[in-house]
Amino acid sequence: MGLSKGGALLLTATLFWACSTAKHQSLVGISQEVSVRRDSWGINHIEAKNEHDLFFAQGYLAAKDRLFQFELWRRKATGTTAALVGPAGLKSDIGARLLRYRKDMDTELNHYHPNGKAIIEAYVAGVNAYIEETRKNPALLPFEFTLLEITPGLWTPEVVISRHNGIRSNAEQELSIARALAHVDAQQIKELLWFHPGEPDLSLDPSIDPNWLAADLLELYQAVSEDIPLNALLDLEEMPEGSNNWVISGERTQSGFPILANDPHRRIALPSLRYMVHLKAPGWNVIGGGEPVIPGVSIGHNEHGAWGLTIFQSDAEDLYLYELNPENPNQYKYQSKWEDMLLIEERIQIK
C-alpha cells in the first residue's frame, strides 16, 4: 500500500496472490506511504514509515476482514447485545456496564506500552475509517449485517481495553475458596491447591456471613464472558478450557537455540479467535497472531525473540462483599462508616 501527502493518504494494497496489478486506495488518516501485501494464506504484511500509520492500517485491514466479529465484540463491550438478540442478552449487557472501566483512561492505555494511548487511538481510527466506508457504501457490509438488519457502530479505545473481560476468571476461584472456608480450615485448602509464590492468607473477613456466599454472586460477571446467543450460530457443546506453555533451554536443543511452546486452548470458531498479521515500521518488525480486535501481536516473534499468551491460574482479581445499610440500600459500610454509592443510570434497549 502506498500513501501520499496532501490531505488524503494513498493506501496501495498489493494483492500478489489475487491479481497481477497493484491496487491503490486513498485514505484520510495516515500521513505517509503504507504498503500492504496479502499472502496466499490471507495474512497482511503491513509496512509503514511511522508507528501511527502502522497501527491505523492494522485496524483498517482487521476491520475489513472481520467486521461482523468486530461488531459482536463492540456490542459485548458496550452492553448493547439485547438490542440485537432480545432478552437473552440482558444479563450480559448489565454485567458489561457494571464492569465498565471508569478510571484514568490515559494511564490505563499507557500501561500496555509507553505509547499505548497513541497506538490504540491509531488502531481505533483505522477501524472507524473502514466502518465509515461501509456507511457510504453498504454493499461492502458482510451478509450478516443485512441478515440481522443492523449496521456497525463506531469504536472507542474503551472497547479495545474491555477485551480483558475475555481473559480473566480469578473471581470465580476467589468465591470457590471462600465457600470452602465456610466448611474446612485454610490448611486443608492449601493441601488441595497449589499457591506460588508465598503463603496466602486465606482467612475470611470475620464480618462476612458465610451464608452470603451461597448466593449466585457472579451471575452478571459470568454473563459478560458468555457468547452472544445468536440462533443462526451452531450451538456446540462446551469443552473444558485450559492452557499450557513451556520453554526448552538452548542447552537441551540440537540447534542450540531455545524453543518456546505456547498452547492457548481456544476453541475452533469461524471466524477464528486469532488474527495473523505482520507489522513492520521503524522500531517494529513482528509477525504472529492475536485477538482480532486488539492492536499488535500477542503470540509471535521478531528478530530477537518469541513470546506467547496463555491464561494462568493467577491471582488477578479480588472479590469484595459489602454490607448494605438496611435503612438505605444505596449505602454500604466501609471502615465502620456508611458511604453513599455513586448512582449511574443506564438505559438498555431490548429487541
Model features per residue range: what roles?
Residues M1-L3:
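N-terminal secretory signal peptides that target proteins for export/translocation
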Residues G7-F16:
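Bacterial N-terminal signal peptides
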Residues D227-L233, R274-G283, P326-K333:
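Short Pro/Gly-enriched beta-strand edge/turn motifs at strand-loop
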Residues V286, E291-K351:
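Compact, glycine/acidic-enriched structural inserts
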Residues E237-M239, R267, S272-G288:
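A conserved hydrophobic secondary-structure block that centers on an alpha-helix together
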